[in-house]
């Protein structure tokens, strides 16, 4: 029996129009349909349960704060760590090595950067880079720390100064000796 003949038979029995019969056969009253539900999706719900779930999905938030939320809570400022603050407005600070380790740099570079976790005299803990080839630092060594980040190593924003305190300079270095605490070579 086709759908049209079936509805016409029902109309004869109940004396209703086609629209009122089809609306009464829906799973929900017409008031709920007119209040925001999508009618074609509801009609497809008989065949497809996934479509039925999509028909009753609640609207999701857009991700922006409403005016009431802004009035109640306001905007939070992002706090960035200030690397100058660790040295306390000083050009250098003395500190004690807590740990000496290596760290791999960001892409595309490849190495093992030597770093030391240092507790400064103002009780701030920082990661400091140990420049040059080879070093004699170990736990409880005293070092002098200056500012200056290492671009490849995330979180390393200080440098250890070579040739001062317990960190020895690099022996037999000819060029850039002042940066690595190397002594002037004996002229022969």
From Swiss-Prot:
Q: Which GO terms describe its molecular function?
A: structural constituent of ribosome
UniProt entry tagged with the keyword Transferase: no
Annotated InterPro entries: NA-bd_OB-fold, Ribosomal_uS12, Ribosomal_uS12_bac
Range annotated as the organelle transit peptide = 1-63
What keywords are assigned to this protein? Mitochondrion, Ribonucleoprotein, Ribosomal protein, Transit peptide
Q: Name one GO cellular component term.
A: mitochondrion
Q: Which domain of life is it from?
A: Eukaryota
**GO biological process, any:** translation
Q: What is its main location?
A: mitochondrion
Cellular compartments annotated: Mitochondrion
What's in the misc comment field?
A: In this plant the mitochondrial S12 gene is nuclear encoded.
Q: Name the PANTHER family for this protein.
A: 30S RIBOSOMAL PROTEIN S12 FAMILY MEMBER
Give the family, as the similarity comment puts it: Belongs to the universal ribosomal protein uS12 family.
- Report the function annotation for this chain: Protein S12 is involved in the translation initiation step.
The UniProt entry, under HAMAP family, shows: Ribosomal_uS12_B
Looking up NCBIfam families in the UniProt record yields: rpsL_bact
Q: What is this protein called?
A: Small ribosomal subunit protein uS12m
What species is this protein from? Answer: Oenothera elata subsp. hookeri
């Amino acid at each position: 029996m086709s759908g049209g003949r079936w509805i016409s038979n029902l109309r004869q029995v109940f004396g209703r129009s086609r629209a009122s019969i089809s609306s009464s056969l829906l799973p929900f009253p017409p008031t709920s349909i007119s209040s925001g539900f999508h009618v074609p999706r509801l009609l497809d719900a008989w065949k497809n349960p996934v479509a039925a779930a999509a028909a009753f999905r609640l609207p999701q938030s857009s991700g922006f704060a409403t005016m009431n939320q802004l009035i109640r809570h306001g905007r939070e400022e992002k706090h960035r760590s200030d690397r100058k603050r660790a040295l306390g407005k000083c050009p250098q600070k003395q500190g004690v090595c807590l740990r000496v380790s290596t760290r791999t740099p960001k892409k595309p570079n490849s190495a093992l950067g030597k770093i030391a976790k240092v507790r400064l005299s103002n009780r701030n803990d920082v990661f400091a880079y140990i420049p040059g080839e080879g070093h004699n630092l170990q736990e409880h060594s005293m070092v002098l720390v200056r500012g200056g980040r290492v671009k490849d190593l995330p979180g390393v924003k200080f440098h250890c100064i070579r040739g001062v305190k317990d960190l020895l300079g690099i022996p037999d270095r000819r060029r850039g000796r002042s940066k690595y605490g190397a002594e002037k070579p004996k002229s022969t």
